[in-house]
């Protein structure tokens, strides 16, 4: 799940180092590269947390963040990486529990039709699978009932980790009977999910053989790849007293 959040808030307790950085352009480039790597390996790429969880000081696992950004700000910062990823052919999108576009009402984006249907699928023309973030998170579950129904009505296709499943299913069935949600809408979502499953070969691929899995993964090639990735990922922010590069002749221990 490539994280497309632009982390411009140093007090962010939940995104922080999960983000590729504070530059929307850099984040977009890294998300696209990550997504393409996953897709090339036969893995569905799902970017998150739409429409952007980078400038918050609240963890939506525990509470609902309060955001009141202008649309111009959203377009230039938060939405930029997501827009670029969509243009590059991203397959999946996870919507976060953030009250964007409807901050005064406190409606999480994951349950907002303005965000999921109007902004993501209509305006930004995203045609892939739309996931909610985990529905057991306090940012969405604390003061809400019939969360799954609201998510489906908003335009989400897949609902992650719902609570009170029996009650949620009953609420959806009642909504279909009352005309608040149609069978056709549910069928469309199911077809989307099955289409991606077939495209990924999940109807044919056997289960992973667990015996000897560690040896098949931990090869000389993968160890070398991990080493090179680590080398390329390190960035020097300051070099006090010219400690770097390390000199094995004068020092024995280095703490990074």
How would you label these PLM feature ranges?
Residues 1:
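Catalytic domains of carbohydrate-active enzymes, especially glycoside hydrolases
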Residues 12-13, 112, 219:
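Serine-centered coil/turn micro-motif
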Residues 22-177, 182-185:
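Second-shell residues forming the walls of enzyme active-site clefts
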Residues 122-123, 142-256:
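Preference for extracellular/luminal or secreted protein segments
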Residues 4-14:
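Short, conserved phosphate-binding/catalytic loop or strand-edge motifs used
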Residues 14, 45-47, 194, 226:
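Exposed boundary/loop context
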